[in-house]
């Protein structure tokens, strides 16, 4: 039996999106898979400045739980956690404990993506020696 493909997924508001779930499911269809989903706890600048991280963590946790449950219904056995607000740091933290074979970063479309405006996918590809796939999820048609 072959070793499972270890997939790290970094997504927040896009974590429930159908394109992301389709990408994960496609990899699961190829053979055994282990999936770790990390949802960075994104916060507004004002809330961050006021040190109010609780609302961001709760929102990320709710989205993450819904994502994990949806994946389980399709036969994928994922696990996940809420990560650092900085998605690159959240990715790095996850890679310290999860030896991924591949990373999927899910973002909003370019015109609405803060992560793409900050070149997150390009920076991740420069920083980590792993294949990094980019999946675009339009939140208005996410599920």
Model regions and ranges:
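Glycine- and acidic-residue-enriched helix-capping/strand-helix junction motifs
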Residues: 50-61
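Residue-level signature of catalytic and energy-coupling elements of molecular machines
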Residues: 24, 91, 124
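N-terminal targeting/anchoring "stem" of glycan-biosynthesis enzymes
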Residues: 88-90, 126, 137
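Small/aliphatic-rich secondary-structure junction motif
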Residues: 2-51, 130-139
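Acidic/glycine-enriched edge-of-secondary-structure segments
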Residues: 4-11, 66-84
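Glycine-rich, Arg-bearing micro-motifs that act as flexible, cationic patches
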Residues: 107-123
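Short secondary-structure boundary segments
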Residues: 39, 102, 107-108
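Structural beta-alpha unit
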Residues: 74-102
């Amino acid at each position: 039996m072959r070793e499972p493909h270890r997939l790290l997924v970094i997504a927040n508001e896009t974590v429930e999106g159908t394109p992301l779930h389709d990408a994960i499911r496609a990899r699961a269809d190829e053979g055994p898979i282990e999936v770790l989903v990390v949802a960075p706890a994104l916060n507004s600048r004002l809330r961050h400045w006021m040190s109010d991280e609780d609302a961001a963590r709760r929102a990320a946790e709710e989205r993450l739980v819904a994502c994990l449950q949806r994946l389980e219904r399709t036969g994928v056995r994922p696990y996940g956690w809420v990560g650092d607000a900085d998605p690159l740091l959240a990715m790095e933290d996850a890679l310290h404990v999860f030896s991924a074979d591949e990373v999927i970063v899910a973002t909003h479309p370019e015109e609405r993506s803060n992560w793409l405006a900050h070149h997150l996918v390009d920076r991740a590809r420069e920083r980590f020696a792993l294949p990094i796939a980019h999946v675009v999820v339009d939140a208005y048609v996410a599920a």
